[in-house]
Curated annotation (Swiss-Prot):
Subunit structure: Oligomer (believed to be a pentamer but probably hexamer).
Keywords for the protein's UniProt record, in alphabetical order: Apoplast, Disulfide bond, Manganese, Metal-binding, Secreted, Signal
A Pfam family hit: Cupin_1
Classification lineage: Eukaryota, Viridiplantae, Streptophyta, Embryophyta, Tracheophyta
UniProt domain Cupin type-1: residue ranges: 67-220
Signal peptide start-end: 1-27
Entry's Gene Ontology molecular function annotations: manganese ion binding
PROSITE patterns: GERMIN
Protein name per its UniProtKB record: Germin-like protein 4-1
Positions bound to Mn(2+): 115, 117, 122, 166
Amino acid sequence: MASRAFAAVFAAVALVVCSSVLPRALASDPSQLQDFCVADKLSAVFVNGFVCKNPKQVTANDFFLPKALGVPGNTVNAQGSAVTPVTVNELPGLNTLGISFARIDFAPNGQNPPHTHPRATEILTVLQGTLLVGFVTSNQPGGGNLQFTKLLGPGDVFVFPQGLIHFQLNNGAVPAVAIAALSSQNPGVITIANAVFGSTPPILDDVLAKAFMIDKDQVDWIQAKFAAPPAASGGGGGFIGGGGGGGFPGGGAP
C-alpha cells in the first residue's frame, strides 16, 4: 500500500513538473547549454537549427555584422517595402540565442503585407515616419476574428504575438523606417497571399474558389499575379513579409 501511495504521489508531482516545464520548452528556441554555439554553415549534418562551430575556431567576426542596418533597403517594388534581416543566416553567432533583428523600409504608401511568423513574437518600433500596424486573432469561439490596430509615430512600440497574422502600412507622404526584434534566431515568415495563391504546385482552383467564394476564373487571375519570380512580382521575400514573392527577410516583412 505504501509503495502504491508513493507511486501515486510521484506521478502527480511528475505531471505538475512536466506541465509547467514543457510549454516553455516547446514555445521557444532550444536553450543554450554553453556560452555560445556559433552556427557552422559548412557542416553537412542536419539538425533543428545549426550544429556548433568548433569553439577554437570562433572569432569576434562570428558575432559581428558591419553596417547591417545602416543602409536603406530598396523599396522600388510592388509592395513599396524592403526588409533587411539579421537572423542566424546572416549572423552565425545568433545560433541558440533565440533572438533576431530586422530593419524595414517603407516608401510612401508602401506596406509590409499580411504575414505571420510561425516561430516568433515580434516587437517593432518606428524610427521615422508613421505606420498603421495591426494583427488579427485566431478564430474566436463564437466565430470571426478580432483585429487590433494602431497608428505609430517615431519612438512608438507595438508587439505582434507569435503566429498571428499582422501587417504594417506607411500611410504617410514620406518614407518610413522601423526596427523589429523577434524571439527566434530564425522566425520564419508566411506571407498570406503568396502562400495561398503562389504555392508550388498551386492549390486547386476548387479549393480556393470555395474558400474565397469566388469563381475559378478569378482564382486563375489572382494566381497569375504570383507566378512571376519574387524580384519581378514585388515585395521580395524575407524576414518580415514579402510582397508578391516569399521569404523571411528581403522584401517586405518581419
